[in-house]
Amino acid sequence: VGMVAGAGLLAGCATAPLYGNPELPAAPRQPPVDYFQVNWWTGLVEKVPLLEYSPREPASPVYDPESRNVIVQTRDGYVRAVGPDGKVAWSLRTGARALAGGLVSEGVVYLPGGDGVLYALDGRTGAVKWKYATSESLATVPVLADGLVLVTSDTDTVFAVKATDGAWAWQYRRDPPSGFTVRGASAPRVDQGTAYVGFSDGFLVALKVEDGGVVWEKSLSGSGTEFLDVDTTPAIDSAGRLYVASYKNGLYALEADSGAVIWNASVGGLTSLLARGEVVFATGDGRVDAYLGETGKLIWSLPLKNRTALAPVLARGMLLVPNERALLFVDPTTGKSRMAWNPGVGISAPPFVVGSRVYVLSNNAYLYALDLNDVKKGPRG
């Protein structure tokens, strides 16, 4: 564990400066203090295979407020808990490469395994409370609703198990299309007893949480067999509008109770959404967009050239967007990229925000605790 301060390297990422030290990931350099400070960092994967050309860590860290541990799954098949001092408190070998991060509720950590096993662990000790085995790779952050844990596989099955003991409750499956699909899966979004889930065949389906019964289904990608995916986790705003994106046909706003289309912005390649207030942020192939939720009007668009923008989060007035190369700091009002920070070989996992603290897992499996300032008032680099 350590921390090194210093000036960063400048490089182009949109129009923002890039800060970091890609050649020496064990010594992350500080960006200007107007943005954040690296409170601590720790390496999690001890040995990197010599033939691993482009390591990738897609599983977001998750914070347990009861134990104050950060729970992380990494590509070496381990789950680790990192304490508030940046030191590993416990570890558990699952042997499976993780595709998504976990969920914490009342001291229990629910973790999806790439080997198809859903784990419930004690956040303080790592003890296994129960596990439920499927035959499919689990690919989304679990959701807790009405006493059930819901999770989606990478082959279009939603599993629901009881949170108390992991007993099977129900499952819903759709057959994937015969053509090419996009990597990723839609986690269920639950609202008022209904789970909204997208599938790789281009359908958005509303399911009853209690038994998995279909409330309605809606095709959003039209005809064809390739890249029909609705892999975005749906979002719902305070007005009750349901937002979801088809990789082929763009961003939709729907009536949550019926699936009726309110509007559609025909922008292909979108893979993640975030709704806050009256604005919907959408990210995907080479772009970050902001839309007005009521009408679908484009507020701004930030091009990223050949980079894919992954799932964004909001923290201290900034939109934080991993783009595989770095973590972008984007002004959510104007769409201007203020800064990019690369701690090593890029970032694929969404950061986890706890107040002004942001936990970031880099692609070379270093976990960083960043303390953010009021970054909207930072320099206009």
PLM feature segments, named:
Residues 83-87, 122-125, 162-166, 208-212, ...:
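Short loop/turn segments that connect beta-strands within beta-propeller blades
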Residues 318, 322-365, 372-380:
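C-terminal closing repeat unit and adjoining cap/tail of repeat-based domains
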Residues 10-12:
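C-terminal motif of bacterial Sec signal peptides marking the signal peptidase cleavage site
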Residues 17-63, 89-105, 128-146, 168-192, ...:
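Extracytoplasmic beta-rich repeat domains
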Residues 74, 113-114, 153-154, 199-200, ...:
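Structural signature of WD-repeat beta-propellers
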